[in-house]
Amino acid sequence: MQPPRRLDSAQQMEEPMQTDAPERSRASLPLSQLLTLSIYWLGIQTIWGGLNITIIPGRLDDLSRETQGTMLAIIMIAGAVAPIVIQPTVGVISDYTVTRWGRRKPYIVIGALLDVVFLAGIAFSNDFVALVAFYFLLQVSSNFAQGPFQGYVPDLVPAKQVGTASGLMGLMLTLGTIVGVGIATLGGITDQLPLATLALGFVEVVTMVILVATVDEGRAGPKRTRPWREIAMSAWARDILEQRDVLWLLLVRLMFLGAYNATLIAIGYFRRSQGLSDADADTIVFVATAIVGVSTALAAIPGGRLSDRFGRRPVIWTAGLIAAIGLVGVTIAPNPAFAVGSWIPFGIGMGLFLSADWALMADVIPKETAGRYMGILNAGTAMAGPVFIIVAGPIQDLTAAAFGDPVGPRVAMAVAAVFLGISALALTRVDPRRRELGDGALVGSGA
């Protein structure tokens, strides 16, 4: 049995005119290495799944049920600022970084360790202002790591395996959500929520160590001919306006992932719209999250391969339709069982989307500065929750005040379905053909 090929991005990421071997000639990577490249997603999503779905909404609901939606919007807005600025900026800096450990690893290690510090702040915060402050700082540190980390797929994965790598990423995100919500739910049941919050960070650090210890990314990046300040400022330079497909895809991701953030109001939905007690609502949200997770996982791997065969856009359109059916079911559900069952098509749609979406991102970005553009596109992920809550949160509170408490969360679920429709329309403007390294050539059909 041959030893696994070492992952070396240095040969792939020189300046465009100096690249000898085209990207499409890379040898295939073993499944074990694709898993290694994806494992850190599990750690990242463990934190955000546990916080955003269970811990933060539950704590805000305890502070003030009447204004929970508005407070959630405030904390999400505060959290959105950091990803928009930090992720593309640190991503493009890492594109040009040269260290003995490689370009991306130093940022990943620093970000993951700081995550634990700021999670401790969240765990022991006793008021809303402190909670917002530490949530913002956690977004800063997490995105300090995520921006460079997202450059790995375009750096290291050959074009023919991007769909599979994207599916594995979707799987890890799903597993991370299940693990995070499971830890948070257990912490709530045992009245050990601060300890559970710290445990989220422990899981992330473990996955970070696995990633850093097993991936050899090489040391060299493109030759730096500009000062670091100029490179950092270039993250959102005006040349991004020339990348119309990247901008449209940013809107696609913003809307689709915004709909996914309907899970943020699941606690309030089951407490208020379905009339469950706090303890029962927490338990059923974990069950619903597990169902969504399993459905997403089952769809993620085949979704990536289906997108390789039939094209990225058809798979994403199908994903949107299936997820919308699930959201409509949740909106009109007459009882908790019907609502939980409706999360199944929602999860399937999300799994298909996550696999095809990541592959489409890797296809359309300019490869010379992958960290920059993956960071920009992932700003859609960072902004998705805040944008959804900014829209759906006040609508939830207003409709609840006008038509009764149970109505608000149902209307917010319907807003998520509208987001999916907007995403589908925006996708029609994205040219899905693959861009190769160096010459900007478009490869393949327009599926």
Question: Which residues does each PLM region occupy?
Answer:
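Structural signature of the two symmetry-related core transmembrane helices
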Residues: R104-A120, P314-G329
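Intracellular juxtamembrane helix-capping segments at the cytosolic ends
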Residues: I56, F144-V157, F353-P366
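Helix-loop boundary and gating motifs at the non-cytosolic
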Residues: A21-A80, D245-V252, F256-G275
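Juxtamembrane intracellular "pre-TM" segments in multi-pass secondary transporters
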Residues: E15-P30, G218-L251, V443-A447
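Multi-pass alpha-helical transporter architecture, strongest
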Residues: A123, V206-V215, A414-A447
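A membrane-interface helix-boundary motif in multi-pass transporters
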Residues: R103, L186-F202, P394-F419
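Glycine-rich segments within core transmembrane alpha-helices of 12-TM secondary carriers
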Residues: P83-I84, G163-T185, N378-I389
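Helix-to-loop junctions at the C-terminal end of transmembrane segments
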Residues: I86-W101, A299-G311
